[in-house]
Amino acid sequence: MGYEPGDVVSGFTLPNANGGGDLSLDDVMTEVGAVVVFECNHCPYVVGSINRINKAAAKAEELGMGFVGINSNDAAVYSEDSFDNMVKRAEKGMPYPYLYDESQDVATAWGAKRTPEFYLVNGEGVVAVSYTHLT
């Protein structure tokens, strides 16, 4: 089913293609909250929205919020979405962490089915707004 506004989210820890090592939701969250966006490398909607996503990340930072991208696609189905290709994309100047949900457990828990999908989580870990299934 996934998270709806008012739901408390569960944490996660995933490998970060933009800076190495694992990163958790707690690492991203601030006392104000965070934006979590499910995205990938191959999706034309994501590719066409990269500038807007980067602007959203900059605005989140300006407001004191965390921002993180999560790729949950199966690299066996979409080779462009492999961790190595995520690293290559991040190296081109991605201004936020880009995490790999290889098992798709996080996407399943959050209810993310398409890309991009955005969740605004407040400082208490409660979904304030979700922009999902827009395509």
Regions found by a protein language model. Give the residues of each.
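Short, thiol/selenol-centered motifs that function as redox-active sites or metal-ligating centers
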Residues: 40-51, 118
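Short active-site neighborhood of thiol/selenol oxidoreductases, capturing the structured segment around
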Residues: 28-44
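Short, internal strand/loop/helix patches
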Residues: 87-115, 119-121
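N-terminal "domain-start" segment that seeds a small globular fold
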Residues: 1-26
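Short loop/turn microsegments at loop-to-beta-strand junctions
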Residues: 9-10, 34, 115-117
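Structural microenvironment flanking redox-active thiols in thiol-disulfide oxidoreductases
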Residues: 48-91, 106
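Short, glycine-anchored, charge-dense loop/turn motifs used at functional sites
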Residues: 118-130
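Conserved small/polar residues in nucleotide/adenosyl-binding loops
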Residues: 132-135
